[in-house]
Amino acid sequence: MLFSGSITYPKTVQTAANGTFDMSNYNGLTYEITAEKGGDYLNGVSTLDLVMIQRHILGLQALDSNYKLIAADANNDGKVTASDLTDLRKLILGVTTALPNNTSWKFPVAGTSVGTSPITCVELIEIENLSADKVNQNFVAVKIGDVNGNVSTSVNSPEVESRSNANVEMSVAEASIAAGEVVEIPVTADNFSEVSGFQYTMNLNGASLVGVQSGVLEVNANNVGVISDNVVTMSYASTEAVNANEGAVLFTLTVKADKAMKVSEMISLNSEVTRAESYNSDLKVGKVSLGVRTAPVAGIELFQNEPNPFKGMTTVSFEMPEAATATLSVYDVTGKVVTVRNINAIKGLNSEIFTKDQLGVSGVLYYTLVSGDFTATKKMIIVE
């Protein structure tokens, strides 16, 4: 955009496909040139950017260029803080479609310095008394929020993201839910190694989200976007890579069923709003999936502990179709193993008694029964 003291200005020209621009017949005046591009806020922005910005804020891995500092300053206050993460996460989750205090792009003048404390840049070229052609009046395009450089434009191909085969695999247990019932659905780890973050869109067919609770992963309402009754988005970013044992509860979804259904009929992941992907410790991009565990036809069944909650003692029971070995493990909400019992289970009903003194903790615990290919997890609560 070209500005001048003349009443015929400002004038605007569109750049060519390769990013060049040309203005003519403007001799003899003093001009100011700026560049701008609106919209497309989410282009190049993902939870991977949140991971990198978090590491920068905590001093674990600094952003390696001043242009990336401009990109990370999402709320345009001259510094990179947790507030920038909040604005970008809402964008990623689909809660907002624009940044409230910033444009989608900034265009520092090429060759000018970028201030870092506070973050500032020169976005205007001034030409006094133009009397001859001026060439190489260039700007640097900075996509706000995109610190890993994967924005897609017509000028340059985006930086190729490193792909990983280390995908995030999670699962939930099959169960029947009655119409109007509010249930807790633990999301457990199937393959969860060296994970720095993930994001996805979840469809809840015939159900609505009530809340989300932490397990191994510290999550809260800020990690979730409720787009509609049936569509929920999630974004999780960690400053350090997370490992979780198979069967460990990563987090728990609380949902309300609008009709009678099975969990397998209700939950599925896709990229409808927030693209489904994961990131490992090397910041490589992989897939994220959510499976549904079904009990084998033989009919092993793990029951809810009784009583629950409990103060002194509780009993965990399970049904076995045949005599077999089984492992009953108790975890805390971080995934740390509290106790493990190796059991020579008999055909029929088996019961194990746990006391508060044996467990040595209070609050929320999870217990998992494993026998052959069967795995099931339930929650117990110890009160003071």
Where do the protein language model's features map onto the residues?
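Short, glycine-anchored, charge-dense loop/turn motifs used at functional sites
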Residues: 305-306, 330-338, 365
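Short Pro-Gly-centered beta-turn/loop motif in secreted/extracellular proteins
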Residues: 22-30
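Short, acidic Ser/Thr/Gly-rich low-complexity loop/linker segments typical of extracellular
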Residues: 6-22
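Acidic, low-complexity intrinsically disordered segments
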Residues: 6, 30, 41-44, 51, ...
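Aromatic/hydrophobic beta-strand junction motif of beta-rich domains
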Residues: 185-189, 314-320, 354
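Acidic carboxylate motifs that coordinate Ca2+ or other divalent cations, activating on Asp/Glu
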Residues: 75-77
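Short, surface-exposed loop/turn motifs with a glycine/proline- and acidic-biased composition
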Residues: 315, 342-373
